[in-house]
Amino acid sequence: MVAKILDGKQIAKDYRQGLQDQVEALKEKGYTPKLSVILVGNNGASLSYVKSKKKAAEKIGMISEIVHLEETATEEEVLNELERLNNDDSVSGILVQVPLPSQVSEQKVLEAINPEKDVDGFHPQNIGKLYIDEQTFVPCTPLGIMELLKNADIDLDGKDAVVIGRSHIVGQPVSKLLIQQNATVTILHSHSKDMSKYLKEADVIVSAVGKPGLVTKEDVKEGAVVIDVGNTPDENGKLKGDVEYEDVKEVAGAITPVPGGVGPMTITMVLNNTLLAEKMRRGLE
């Protein structure tokens, strides 16, 4: 068996076309979605990622801006910028690029974002809504994973899913989304014993811990769906996933590559949530 490759680049491209059509329809009503991104400091990876978000937003007809603060910016300065964006009626969605410098509390900043503009889905209010099945902004990587699975017509009802990683950014929210689709979910983490035992029984595996080579061919049963969220740069700067891709694709039923799998879907869901934010505040959703 050779796995079906879940091509995040192509799926994202098709999805963005649908978003672009919706943006154009909104513009005809007099509304243009706007995404504002706060970047503190000059981390190369963060700067590159923020620029790619801006470019993607503008490509589908949105307005986007980067609010770039110095590495030495105080917490108060960051919070003041957030307050300005919260109160700016032209801004549909706000996200703060992490990590933040040590003098700025990430939690305090995330909690200061207006929940109605929180397109990353990290505000406690939106996290809470997710867990009681209310409409809300869902964190973008988990949302992108679910769209990949949906696009591939993967039926999750009654399936055994194993999620490796329990972060609030990926592991926990994607587990909740899988449960919403009636999967039976097991979460593994650094204290879990005999991970291979659980992996071998899984119909779906989502690995999101950033440990290259963690999931091997021997861990995966034939026909399983494998979603690799890992993107760790090696000594040459090449991104490596958590999964031994070349080996695992020989037994898996479907698999995401790294890069080009989950990554493009994450940025696409930032755009999706920005559009949703604009629709909701205009009473159109």
Swiss-Prot record:
Its EC number is 1.5.1.5, 3.5.4.9. GO terms for molecular function: methenyltetrahydrofolate cyclohydrolase activity; methylenetetrahydrofolate dehydrogenase (NADP+) activity. NADP(+) binds at residues 165-167, 190. It catalyses: (6R)-5,10-methylene-5,6,7,8-tetrahydrofolate + NADP(+) = (6R)-5,10-methenyltetrahydrofolate + NADPH; (6R)-5,10-methenyltetrahydrofolate + H2O = (6R)-10-formyltetrahydrofolate + H(+). GO terms for cellular component: cytosol. It holds the Pfam family THF_DHG_CYH_C. Keywords: Amino-acid biosynthesis, Histidine biosynthesis, Hydrolase, Methionine biosynthesis, Multifunctional enzyme, NADP, One-carbon metabolism, Oxidoreductase, Purine biosynthesis. Pathway: One-carbon metabolism; tetrahydrofolate interconversion. GO terms for biological process: L-histidine biosynthetic process; methionine biosynthetic process; purine nucleotide biosynthetic process; tetrahydrofolate interconversion. InterPro entries: Aminoacid_DH-like_N_sf, NAD(P)-bd_dom_sf, THF_DH/CycHdrlase, THF_DH/CycHdrlase_cat_dom, THF_DH/CycHdrlase_CS, THF_DH/CycHdrlase_NAD-bd_dom. Homodimer. Catalyzes the oxidation of 5,10-methylenetetrahydrofolate to 5,10-methenyltetrahydrofolate and then the hydrolysis of 5,10-methenyltetrahydrofolate to 10-formyltetrahydrofolate. Belongs to the tetrahydrofolate dehydrogenase/cyclohydrolase family. This is Bifunctional protein FolD. The lineage of its organism: Bacteria, Bacillati, Bacillota, Bacilli, Bacillales.
